[in-house]
Design a protein with these regions (language model features):
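Catalytic alpha/beta core domains of metabolic enzymes, predominantly
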Residues: 128-129, 140-177
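Active-site beta->alpha loop and helix N-cap motifs at the rims of alpha/beta catalytic domains
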Residues: 2-146
Length: 177
């Protein structure tokens, strides 16, 4: 399935801009700096990568550029797979070209405030269509819902697609669970 096991420290790449456009020279510098710094994998177009502010063409350009500059040196995670509509998200995943990526990162539905059962069902639908392993991104400050440790454990037991968790709840007790 994926060429690499994701281990260690991953960096969510910023997407630099100049005069309202993606600054690809600066993005290359960011990628090279991270690789030289010894990180173990890169995340392109996560929350930090401004995916929500880019149009689909710009997103694809950033992803393709990141693949090109990385040149297979590190595992790559594509990080802009969150949506408050599960059907729309799974449709996006089903038609997305994941060539060059080793995993995808997906946040729970935003705004809707689903129950833990709703979050579980959402992620199971994502797992059904994803050709890649999934990093669960728990970021309640952006989604208005917290993915509990119990739900994460339930997902991990339900499907081998769930590879890791990016825990951004800001709760050390939860992170330790």
């Amino acid at each position: 399935m994926n060429r690499f096991r994701l281990r260690g420290t991953g960096v969510a790449l910023v997407t630099p801009f100049k005069n309202g456009k993606v600054d690809f020279d600066a993005l290359e510098n960011v990628i090279e700096h991270c690789i030289r710094g010894g990180v173990e994998f890169l995340v392109s177009l996560g929350t930090t990568g401004e995916a929500i502010t880019l149009n689909p063409k710009e997103c694809r350009e950033v992803l393709d550029f990141t693949i090109k500059i990385n040149a297979g040196r590190l595992p790559l995670v594509v990080g802009f797979f969150g949506d408050n509509d599960t059907a729309r998200l799974t449709e996006k995943i089903a038609h997305f070209d994941f060539t060059g990526f080793d995993a995808l990162m997906s946040s729970s539905p935003s705004y809707n405030k689903p129950s833990q059962e709703g979050i579980f069902q959402h992620y199971m639908k994502v797992a059904e269509v994803s050709p890649l392993p999934i990093i669960i991104y728990n970021v309640p400050s952006r989604t208005a819902s917290n993915v509990t440790a119990a739900t994460i454990l339930r997902l991990a037991h339900a499907s081998e697609k769930f590879l890791a968790v990016k825990e951004a709840a800001g709760d050390m007790v939860q992170a330790m669970q």
